[in-house]
């Protein structure tokens, strides 16, 4: 059976995942490449109801109030439902799928809740559960958009003001976001993710500049 390819954009909150995912999709459309675009969590869908409760602070006001394994399962079920409903058949028949967040997000945001010594065990469980037991595809390529936490904090506060939206419990917790970034760099190295340094001399690189770096790697993958 001809399996497809799955490209994932990962990074802490405010790192530009949605923007880079969109730019890649626009570029692929221009190049006449067929793809399917997905993003997680799927707010508003029944399968994401528990995720919404968690991020809204209904299970605890702080990320650490909900243990890493419990929180991960909520996100896993949403991904599984999405795979069955939206993109599994397309992927299994050789399709190209572009994802804004994936299993990789639990590796970034949930493993960071655990002491260093327990993170490895958690990652083995997470990947074994989703890619092994649930049968979700393993990504072909993961871009880790690396942005210093002080920059993402500023960008997120600006976004909240501009869009009049409140931060969820992850976004509102600066110490937690710093922990996520530290953890993410370790996970990216362990899992062979493509790290994209999104700043230069403390300033954000232009989004087109970052896109060109991303696109060069995608082209190499697609051949």
Indicate residue ranges for each PLM-predicted region:
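Walker A (P-loop) phosphate-binding loop of P-loop NTPases
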Residues: 14
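Hydrophobic positions on the alpha1 helix immediately C-terminal to the Walker A/P-loop
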Residues: 20
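Conserved lysine of the Walker
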Residues: 17
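ATP-dependent small-molecule kinase phosphotransfer cores
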Residues: 31-134
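Pre-Walker A (Motif I) flank of P-loop NTPase domains
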Residues: 3-6
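Hydrophobic anchor at the beta1->P-loop junction of P-loop NTPases
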Residues: 9
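NTP-dependent small-molecule kinase module
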Residues: 25, 150-223
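A glycine- and Lys/Arg-enriched "phosphate-lid" helix/loop adjacent to the NTP-binding pocket
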Residues: 104-182
């Amino acid at each position: 059976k001809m399996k497809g390819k799955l490209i994932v954009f990962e990074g802490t909150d405010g790192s530009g995942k949605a923007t880079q995912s969109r730019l890649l999709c626009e570029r692929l459309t221009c190049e006449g490449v067929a793809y399917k675009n997905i993003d997680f969590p799927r707010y508003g869908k029944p399968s994401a109801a528990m995720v919404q409760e968690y991020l809204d602070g209904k299970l605890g006001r702080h990320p650490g109030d909900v243990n890493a394994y419990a929180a991960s399962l909520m996100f896993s079920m949403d991904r599984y439902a999405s795979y069955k409903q939206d993109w599994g058949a397309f992927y299994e028949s050789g399709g190209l799928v572009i994802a804004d967040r994936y299993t990789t997000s639990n590796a970034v945001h949930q493993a960071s809740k655990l002491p260093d010594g327990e993170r490895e065990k958690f990652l083995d469980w997470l990947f074994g559960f989703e890619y092994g037991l649930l049968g979700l595809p393993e990504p072909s390529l993961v871009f880790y958009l690396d942005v210093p936490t002080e920059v993402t904090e500023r960008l997120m506060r600006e976004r909240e003001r501009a869009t009049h939206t409140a931060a969820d419990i992850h976004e509102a917790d600066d110490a937690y976001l710093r922990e996520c970034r530290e953890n993410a760099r370790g996970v990216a190295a362990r899992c062979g993710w493509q790290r994209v340094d999104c700043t230069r001399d403390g300033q954000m690189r232009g989004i087109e500049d970052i896109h060109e770096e991303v696109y060069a790697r995608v082209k190499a993958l697609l051949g």
